[in-house]
């Protein structure tokens, strides 16, 4: 299952951040996400997750914006997406959280543990983070 989940996260990253990763065929990646999810969950849950990808992407873009707008060391948003470990963690968390909400067993916890192992940052898939808004004191 871990190999499937690792592949899922590669696809989710490309699906959510195509503008930063030179994505060529987002529709193909979404179909691949659905295919992987059908191996770990039933068809209804897989389809429900795919329907939530636009909202997951929106939330992750607000995460990127909050970092880019508040960290004076940031050069641009591409740097945040490619280099900041917290974005990897948030991608795993937001994916895992959605799967948990849909009642998919085991996979949500494995996803957050994969991110924890890679970054040292641990967020339980049941945590409620919500939208991260840019600060009113963001740099100009």
Protein language model features and the residues they cover:
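Structural signal for interior beta-strand "rungs" in well-ordered beta-sheet cores
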Residues: 115-140
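Terminal amphipathic alpha-helical/low-complexity segments used for targeting or macromolecular assembly
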Residues: 1-113
């Amino acid at each position: 299952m871990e190999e499937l989940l690792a592949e899922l996260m590669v696809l989710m990253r490309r699906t959510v951040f195509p503008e930063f990763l030179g994505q060529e065929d987002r529709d193909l990646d979404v179909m691949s996400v659905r295919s992987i999810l059908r191996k770990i969950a039933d068809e209804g849950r897989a389809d429900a997750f795919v329907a939530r990808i636009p909202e997951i992407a929106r939330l992750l873009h607000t995460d990127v914006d909050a970092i880019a707008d508040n960290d004076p060391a940031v050069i641009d948003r591409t740097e945040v997406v490619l280099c900041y470990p917290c974005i990897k963690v948030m991608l795993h968390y937001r994916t895992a959280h959605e799967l948990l909400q849909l009642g998919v067993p085991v996979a949500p916890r494995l996803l957050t543990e994969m991110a924890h192992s890679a970054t040292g940052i641990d967020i339980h898939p049941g945590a409620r983070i919500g939208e991260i808004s840019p600060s009113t004191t963001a740099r100009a």
